[in-house]
Amino acid sequence: MSTTPQYAASPKTGIVAISTANANRDGTGTLGTVFTAAANGSRIDRIIVTATGTTTAGTIRLYIHNGTTAYLYDEVSVDAITPSGTVSAFRYDNTNVNITIPTGYSLRASTANAETFNVIAMGGDY
């Protein structure tokens, strides 16, 4: 145990575009890798999900992957939205994440419907 506080040494942003429908909740099927931990581990402070077009009601699933198995971490409900000049596309922004992930772990994502989303994780490497 360290006698001094440990802070992220360098900021890090991970981004993936997902679009392959995956109805599985068990971590199998197509998952996009959003953020991978550095050699000394990493932390994730914020997760943003943004649709790139029209969405139907569905779910974005976030997983913690330990290098072998993906474990469901969170689900984000997606609203049906048709973006236009006056209507914004679907967006989810969680600024209260605070996940610490060790070396070899990653954050992964999937979409229940075949619609394109950009999944962004912001944090830092130790």
Listing of model-derived features with the role each one plays in the protein:
Residues 86-104:
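Beta-sandwich interaction modules
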Residues 51-59, 113-117:
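Extended, low-complexity, turn-rich repeat/linker tracts enriched in Gly/Pro/Ser/Thr and Asp/Glu
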Residues 55-76:
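Short, surface-exposed beta-strand/strand-loop-strand elements in extracellular ectodomains
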Residues 45-50, 107-109:
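Buried hydrophobic-core signal for structured, non-transmembrane domains
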Residues 78-87:
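Short proline/glycine- and polar residue-rich coil/turn motifs
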Residues 38-46, 55:
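Extended extracellular/luminal ectodomain segments enriched in beta-structured repeat modules
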Residues 33, 77-79, 96-98:
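Beta-strand-rich interaction surfaces with strong enrichment in secreted/lumenal proteins
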Residues 1-41, 102-104, 110-126:
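C-terminal interaction-tip segments
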